[in-house]
A protein has these predicted regions:
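Proline-aspartate-enriched helix->loop->beta-strand connector
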Residues: 143-160, 175, 279-292
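Bacterial Sec-exported substrate-binding components of ABC uptake systems
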Residues: 2-103, 201-233, 352-355
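His/Asp/Glu-enriched short active-site or ligand-binding loop at hydrolase and phosphoryl-transfer sites
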Residues: 246-274
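Structured C-terminal subdomain patch of bacterial secreted/periplasmic proteins
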Residues: 96, 189-190, 195-198, 204, ...
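Extracytoplasmic/secreted envelope proteins and their assembly/folding machinery
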Residues: 91-95, 101, 105-106, 144, ...
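Extracytoplasmic ligand-binding site segments that recognize negatively charged/polar headgroups
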Residues: 163-165, 178-192, 196, 226-254, ...
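Short, solvent-exposed loop/turn elements at domain surfaces
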Residues: 88-91, 105-110, 125-129, 239-244, ...
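A short, structured surface patch at a secondary-structure boundary
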Residues: 60-62, 70-74, 78, 96-150, ...
Length: 355
């Protein structure tokens, strides 16, 4: 793990933008940038065109990937395999799957197993997880009682550190359980989920499609000369609803890496949705582009809330040039099958900045 930049150490956020600057920015909220990158999706993952109810601040860019791949998988159980914790597990019944993370739900849906998804985390943004029949909270405060009380037949976690113990508890209760290793690329995650349910060939097909998209994204930006663009991805979905910087192990980090750019969060040694940053630290990292999700912008209540959440970003190179990209939250925050399509859209938008 990279050494954490001391300037990114955690502290309380403080306000501090000139009123004139905020007023000017808010006035620009009335129109959208005409040159924004707009790609709508006709896939089963829904319409990814810019939300009609959301008007982006002037100069900001809507970036959305299209052509999200799917594959038709066949359920073949029982299966005995090694999961992400290194344990040999047997899966016999997948009629009601409890997913430990929405990325697992997204992958299941892309493999044609949407109807098997029974319960998902309450804070999900992925469509397949949001539409699950049941939702649950799982944290240090809630413990595992609520999770274990769900009448599922299979638990699939997405993080050995977070879900290894939960999976063991499920097995003790007679419920099948397996965990995906979250530290592997998206292709490995897809193959793991498909293998758990008995169709590794379908997993290879879907993973291959996403991996080819990531290669395509890299090719778009490979010809770009000069320094690697620095991208800062921010969210309103940190622990306890805190504002956070996206670091290692996130969908945004994988997309940024595929584009040949530098993730500010990863470079600072941050992992997941991290609150371990300072306003001054973000300013010193001099991001060329700021990236966030449409759900985050909505949660902040628009531009004014965003400026209060990250008061120094307007003073960064990205802020001064209005190089702020907004993506569908389902693409920027879910390490699922949309990562490749999102990376292509992001690469095209970055390429446009370099011309």
């Amino acid at each position: 793990m990279p050494h954490m930049d001391p300037a990114i150490a955690r502290r309380t956020l403080v306000a501090g933008l000139p009123v004139a600057l905020i007023s000017s920015c808010l006035a620009g909220c009335r129109s959208q940038r005409q040159s924004a990158v707009r790609e709508s999706s006709s896939s089963s993952h829904g319409n990814l065109s810019a939300p009609a109810a959301m008007r982006l601040p002037q100069g900001w860019t809507w970036v959305a990937g299209s052509d999200i791949p799917v594959a038709k998988a066949t359920l073949r159980l029982p299966v005995t395999t090694t999961d992400g914790t290194g344990r040999r597990v047997t899966i016999k019944n997948a009629n009601r799957i409890i997913v430990g993370g929405e990325d697992v739900a997204d992958i299941l849906a892309a493999l044609g197993w949407r109807k098997l998804i029974y319960a998902a985390p309450t804070n999900s943004v992925a469509e397949a997880a949001v539409n699950a029949p049941k939702h649950y909270g799982f944290s240090k405060k809630t413990g595992m009682e609520g999770l274990l009380s769900i009448d599922g037949t299979l638990f699939i976690g997405n993080n050995p550190m977070r879900h290894g113990r939960a999976a063991a508890k499920f097995r003790e209760a007679g419920v099948d359980a397996a965990v995906v290793n979250d530290r592997q690329p998206i292709g490995g995650k897809i193959r793991a989920v498909a293998t758990f349910l008995g169709d590794p060939k379908a997993g290879d097909k879907l993973a291959g499609a996403v991996e080819r998209q990531l290669v395509e994204a890299a090719a778009i930006t490979r010809a770009r000369q000069g320094h690697r663009l620095r991208i800062l991805a921010v969210t309103a979905s940190g622990a306890g609803g805190a504002n956070a910087v996206m670091g290692m192990g996130t969908a945004s980090a994988e997309m940024i890496a595929a584009c040949g750019a530098t993730s500010v969060g990863v470079r600072a040694g941050l992992r997941g949705y991290s609150v371990k940053f300072t306003d001054e630290g973000l300013l010193s990292m001099k991001p060329d582009v700021i990236l966030t999700g449409d759900g985050d912008l909505k949660r902040w209540g628009g531009l004014e809330g965003y400026l209060k959440a990250f008061p120094t970003l307007a003073q960064t190179p990205a802020g001064r040039k209005n190089h702020v990209f907004v993506m569908p939250s389902e693409q920027i925050k879910v390490s699922g099958v949309g990562v490749g399509a999102g990376a292509i859209a992001l690469a095209r938008a970055l390429d446009a900045l370099s011309r």
